């Protein structure tokens, strides 16, 4: 399915063939971005995520970087480590699922008001399938915020070629011109 973008087969294959569940088994209660990046991301979330909405924090951890003063109806977290997700005070509920094995989200169609993928999209082996699932569960016009970092677990890398094309093809950005 990934070759729908004209990418070679295996373009998103990771360097390390080990099962992702093994890599994510030990909890990592650390910040994956620095204070400046956290402040910038929180500020952006403040402007784009709908207060009172249902949010999906895909590929989450023990912290979501959401503005502390804004309330949301529900924040659904997804990740690979139950300890990390359970430690996240902003999550209303959460689920553990390896999206590289099964990219289908256990959520109803058009049930989410906004979604975030914070510094993690580069670890997906089926990013197009996951983005299609996000398009399915997001309400029409709902934002998807994908943030990036210059940090990466090198043993768990995917080739980044095509991620921007994947995002643009399946979650087009509204025009920002006046």
Regions inferred by a protein language model and the residue ranges of each:
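Local beta-strand N-terminus motif with an aromatic residue
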Residues: 52, 112-113
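Class I SAM-dependent methyltransferase SAM/SAH-binding core
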Residues: 32-36, 40-106
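Conserved class I S-adenosyl-L-methionine
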Residues: 143-176
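Class I SAM-dependent methyltransferase Rossmann-like catalytic core
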Residues: 1-51
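A short glycine-rich, Lys/Arg-flanked "PGG" loop and its adjoining helix->strand segment in the class I
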Residues: 128-143
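A short SAM/SAH-binding and catalytic strip from SAM-dependent methyltransferases
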Residues: 113-128
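Short conserved AdoMet
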Residues: 50, 125, 139
């Amino acid at each position: 399915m990934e070759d729908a973008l004209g990418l070679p087969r295996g373009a998103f294959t990771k360097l390390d063939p080990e099962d992702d569940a093994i890599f994510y088994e030990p909890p990592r209660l650390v910040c994956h971005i620095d204070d400046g990046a956290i402040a910038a991301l929180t500020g952006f979330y403040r402007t784009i995520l709908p207060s009172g909405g249902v949010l999906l924090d895909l590929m989450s951890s023990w912290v979501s970087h959401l503005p502390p003063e804004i309330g949301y109806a529900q924040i659904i977290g997804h990740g690979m480590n139950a300890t990390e997700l359970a430690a996240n005070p902003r999550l209303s509920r959460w689920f553990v699922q390896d999206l590289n094995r099964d990219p289908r989200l256990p959520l109803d169609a058009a049930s989410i008001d906004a979604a975030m993928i914070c510094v993690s999209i580069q670890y997906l082996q089926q990013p197009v399938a996951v983005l299609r699932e996000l398009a399915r569960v997001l309400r029409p016009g709902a934002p998807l915020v994908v943030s990036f970092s210059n940090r990466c677990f090198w043993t768990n890398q995917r080739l980044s070629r095509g991620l921007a094309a994947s995002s643009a093809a399946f979650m087009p950005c509204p025009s920002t011109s006046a």
